[in-house]
Amino acid sequence: MQRVTITLDDDLLETLDSLSQRRGYNNRSEAIRDILRGALAQETAQQHGTQGFAVLSYVYEHEKRDLARRLVSTQHHHHDLSVATLHVHVSHEDCLEIAVLKGDMGDIQHFADDVIAQRGVRHGHLQCLPDDE
C-alpha cells in the first residue's frame, strides 16, 4: 500500500468525517478507499461492451400527459435488459419504479438515459455492478 496526500476543502472533509462515522469506518483512509472502489467499479461497469447488472430507480408523475405510456413503450423496446421491475405508489401523483437490469452496460446506460430524460421523471438514478465472471 502507498501513502498519498490529498487536499480537501473544509465542507468536504466534514462530510467525509460524518460519512465515516455513520458507516463505522475506523479512519478516513478506509472511507476514501471504499468510496474510490465504488466509483471505479461504476466507471468500469458503464463501459460499452462490458456485461453487468444495474438497478434503475426513478420517481415519475403518473398523470403527466402520456408519460406512463411512453415509459412502458421504452421498457418494451429494451425488454431484453429487464430482469424485474417493482412499481410503488408513493403518493396520489407520484410512482416509484425500480428496475433490475442485466446485459451490455452501454445498452443499459442508453435505456436509463431514455427513461430519465422523459418529462415528468424525477430523481432518476442508475447503479451499475460489473459482472465479474
Swiss-Prot record:
Protein role: Transcriptional repressor of the nikABCDE operon. Is active in the presence of excessive concentrations of intracellular nickel.
Keywords (A to Z) from UniProt: DNA-binding, Metal-binding, Nickel, Repressor, Transcription, Transcription regulation
Protein name: Nickel-responsive regulator
Residue positions binding Ni(2+): 76, 87, 89, 95
Gene3D superfamilies for the chain: ACT-like. Chain A, domain 2 (3.30.70.1150), Met repressor-like (1.10.1220.10)
Cofactor comment: Binds 1 nickel ion per subunit.
Gene behind the chain: nikR
Cofactor(s) of this protein: Ni(2+)
Top-level taxon of origin: Bacteria
Family statement: Belongs to the transcriptional regulatory CopG/NikR family.
Claim: Transcription is one of the keywords in the record: yes
GO MF assignments: DNA-binding transcription factor activity; nickel cation binding; sequence-specific DNA binding
Gene Ontology biological process terms, A to Z: response to nickel cation
UniProt lineage: Bacteria, Pseudomonadati, Pseudomonadota, Gammaproteobacteria, Enterobacterales
